[in-house]
Swiss-Prot record:
Accumulates in pollen grains and pollen tube. Mostly expressed in mature pollen grains, and, to a lower extent, in inflorescences and siliques. One of its GO terms (molecular function) is DNA-binding transcription factor activity. Transcription activator. Binds to 5'-CAACTGTC-3' and/or 5'-TAACAAA-3' motif in target gene promoter to promote their expression. Together with MYB101 and MYB120, functions as a male factor that controls pollen tube-synergid interaction in fertilization. Required for pollen tube growth arrest and sperm cell release in the female gametophyte, probably via the regulation of pollen tube-specific gene expression. Transmembrane segments: none annotated. It is found in: Nucleus. InterPro entries: Homeodomain-like_sf, Myb_dom, SANT/Myb. This is Transcription factor MYB97. Residues 16-68, 69-123 form the HTH myb-type domain. Coiled coil: none annotated. The lineage of its organism: Eukaryota, Viridiplantae, Streptophyta, Embryophyta, Tracheophyta. Gene3D superfamilies: Homeodomain-like. Disruption phenotype: The triple mutant myb97 myb101 myb120 is impaired in pollen tube growth arrest and subsequent sperm cell release in the female gametophyte thus leading to a drastically reduced fertility. Altered pollen tube-specific gene expression. PROSITE patterns: HTH_MYB. Keywords: Activator, DNA-binding, Nucleus, Repeat, Transcription, Transcription regulation.
Length: 389
């Protein structure tokens, strides 16, 4: 007998409730069944308080599960149940409660008793515990355990990827970089040159291209709507777009972006013109020096022109290459110098007027074609530069 404290005896003296152990009587079974029909399964510790049954909660639970359940099945296991027990044991091992859940009406204690009895019998006879098909499956599961399948990485939209070169430029002031004129400073200060020469940009651009080729799902294909203004620098390298549909805010941002773009392009044009002027000045000085040297030479057209011209002036003339993008002022100045040279040649007393043929230009200048044609190829348009190669 077990004394369960907290209660009071019939004679009024303090004491505990005496819990009963051992076999259950028919009256106790009927009391427990009536409690389950009224309150349902569970909360077995309240059975004693509500029915004054002198049994603990664990004893009530086991009595109901193993003996009093309506769907409880008694007797030996059927061949189908035995086959299922063997299959489940080969997969789960000694998980008796999980095996009992697969066998309605059977308790985990019954399944455990059946397996232990079978195990001892097969060990005495030297027989395998599992049939060949179950043994092979069990061996394969031990050799190659099932790994939890890792979920596929979520496919993030391409627009959520952030690349430094795909971000819109910040609305910085006009002179946000060094504009001091020098070949090195201008090349470094130019955003376009910086992007082209930066190895970080080349690496990012190549990585992005390879990433798009291997992953077509992430290929970035954006279609610009009517209120989206693309921003592009020279060489088509730095390309960004503003994707927003927020009315006035979007309009203000696009206006500021367009203004910043125009200012940046103006700065680039100014630096390009300054750089071009720096390279034109030495060429212009070489031409003027050559013309002055030729004017000082009295025998310019006599005895063969190629032998009279000094080596320095000839090299300077041969090193010149006409460019189509020179300014109109440069062309006018050179035309005036050539006209002076031709005027001087027409007034020279050493021009031969013998058997050689002469050429009359639009300015009524008479020249010897043998002495003049090999230096300057004559063109109908006198405003064009002579083809010096």
């Amino acid at each position: 007998m077990i004394v369960y404290g907290g209660g009071a005896s019939e004679d009024g003296e303090g004491g505990g409730v005496v819990l009963k152990k051992g076999p259950w009587t028919v009256a106790e079974d009927e009391t427990l069944a009536a409690y389950v029909r009224e309150y349902g399964e569970g909360n077995w510790n309240s059975v004693q308080k509500k029915t004054w049954l002198a049994r603990c909660g664990k004893s009530c639970r086991l009595r109901w599960a193993n003996h009093l359940r309506p769907n409880l099945r008694k007797g030996s296991f059927t061949p189908e149940e035995e086959r299922l027990i063997i299959q489940l044991h080969s997969q789960l091992g000694n998980k008796w409660a999980r095996m009992a859940a697969q066998l309605p009406g059977r308790t985990d204690n019954e399944i455990k008793n059946y397996w232990n009895t079978r195990l001892k019998r097969f060990q005495r006879q030297g027989l395998p515990l599992y049939p060949p098909e179950y043994s092979q499956n069990n061996h394969q599961q031990q050799m190659y355990p099932q790994q939890p399948s890792s979920p596929l990485p979520s496919q993030t939209p391409a627009s959520s990827f952030t690349f430094p070169l795909l971000q819109p430029p910040s609305l910085c002031p006009k002179r946000c970089y060094n504009t001091a004129f020098s070949p090195k400073a201008s090349y470094i200060s130019s955003p376009t040159n910086f992007l082209v020469s930066s190895p970080t940009f080349l690496h990012t651009h190549s990585s992005l291209s390879s990433y798009q080729s291997t992953n077509p799902v992430y290929s970035m294909k954006h279609e610009l709507s009517s209120n989206q203004i693309p921003y592009s620098a020279s060489l088509g390298v730095y390309q960004v777009s503003k994707f927003s549909d927020n009315g006035d805010c979007n309009q203000n941002l696009n206006t500021g972006l367009h203004t910043n773009t125009c200012q940046l392009l103006e700065d680039l044009m100014e630096e390009a013109e300054a750089l071009a002027d720096s390279f034109r000045a030495p060429k212009r000085r070489q031409i003027m020096a050559a013309l002055e040297d030729n004017n000082n030479n009295n025998n310019f057209f006599s005895g063969g022109f190629g032998h009279r011209v000094s080596s320095n002036s000839l090299c300077s003339l041969q090193g010149l290459t006409p460019k189509e993008d020179e300014s109109l002022q440069m062309n006018t100045m050179q035309d005036e110098d050539i006209t002076k040279l031709l005027d001087w040649g027409s007034e020279s007393e050493e021009i031969s007027n013998g058997q050689s043929s002469v050429i009359t230009t639009e300015n009524n200048l008479v020249l010897d074609d043998h002495q003049f044609a090999f230096l300057f190829p004559v063109d109908d348009d006198t405003n064009n530069l002579p083809g010096i190669c």
